[in-house]
């Protein structure tokens, strides 16, 4: 495997675990303010991010590459209103998308077709992640502070269940 692609994949493991930490912090915020549906949404999101990290880990292991673990940074964000985590999540997903795209570009340059094939799944996944984050913001904006709308959305988000990724390495 190309050394740069391996390095970037190793770094992505840390970024995915950071994403899980960030989303658990959002879940913790929503639990503290009594929005258990939002808490559930971000707890499930944290599970997804953890699994993304493990997919990168497994890909590197399957290809004879060592994995280097770095410290996971503490999530830093300013608590504000209930919209703050939603906006921060969209901003964060855009950063993750840029990171995946950079790994894909490096794999393309190195003609690492197996890595590109694996990354195809993540490119599609990131499109879904950004759309989901943007959709939550849109729904919150539609309510315009209406508590009934917030309760309805909270109930909707409470129904989300975790589904393991479909990528097979």
Model regions: which residues?
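Iron-associated oxidoreductase/ferritin-like identity signal
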Residues: 1-169
């Amino acid at each position: 495997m190309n050394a740069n692609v391996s390095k970037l994949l190793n770094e992505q493991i840390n970024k995915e675990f950071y994403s899980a930490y960030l989303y658990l912090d959002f879940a913790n915020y929503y639990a503290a303010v009594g929005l258990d549906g939002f808490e559930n949404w971000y707890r499930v999101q944290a599970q997804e991010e953890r699994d993304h990290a493990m997919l990168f880990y497994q890909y590197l292991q399957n290809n004879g590459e060592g994995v280097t673990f770095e410290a996971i940074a503490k999530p830093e964000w300013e608590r504000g209103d209930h919209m703050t985590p939603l906006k921060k999540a969209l901003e964060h997903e855009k950063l993750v998308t840029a990171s995946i795209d950079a790994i894909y570009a490096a794999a393309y340059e190195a003609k690492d077709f197996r890595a590109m094939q694996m990354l195809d799944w993540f490119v599609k996944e990131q499109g879904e992640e950004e759309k989901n984050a943007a959709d939550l913001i849109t729904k919150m904006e539609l309510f315009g502070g209406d508590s009934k709308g917030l309760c309805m959305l909270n109930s909707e988000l409470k129904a989300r269940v975790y589904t393991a990724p479909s990528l097979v390495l």
